[in-house]
Amino acid sequence: VSAPHFDLGQGEEGRVFVYLGSTHGLSTMGADYILQLPQAGAHFGHSVASAGDVNGDGCSDILIGAPEYDNGQEDEGAVFVYFGSPGGLVTSSYWSAESDDAGSRYGSSVASAGDVNGDGFSDVIVGAPEYYYGSGSIVLYYGSANGLGSSTSLIGSHEDFGYCVSSAGDVNGDGYSDIIV
């Protein structure tokens, strides 16, 4: 559950609440994990999704976008993956990537892509609808035994390409997952 405008004292840093299922359903006592990014205006949690199992350890991972994250450029955006484990969510470390384009709003949309290349690992899609003066782009990161690694970028020629991203399942029945942008 995301609260991208959650104020931790700096203004709209954002917060994500993770609730674990059990034989009794979800806990009503509060979130099992609370994730946050201590940067004013980052809007951590603007987009959230299951990443699938990007590292093949048998546990689902979590994908979180912060489209107004700044690291040298205003609103370049970032995406974060927290890894699941048999002991629960690993919060002490995470994988992250960010845009190289000011104002791109990278991480505005995030989704599991399924297994696009058929290697047995889940892949993820990240949208940056304002990349390159609003043309937009998506980045597809491929899962591996080491987590997310190599990537493929598609740059749009249309306004806000990457505004929404999703897995499409296997549209043509060839055994590979497809995506929707």
Language-model features: where?
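Conserved beta-strand/short-helix segments
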Residues: 1-181
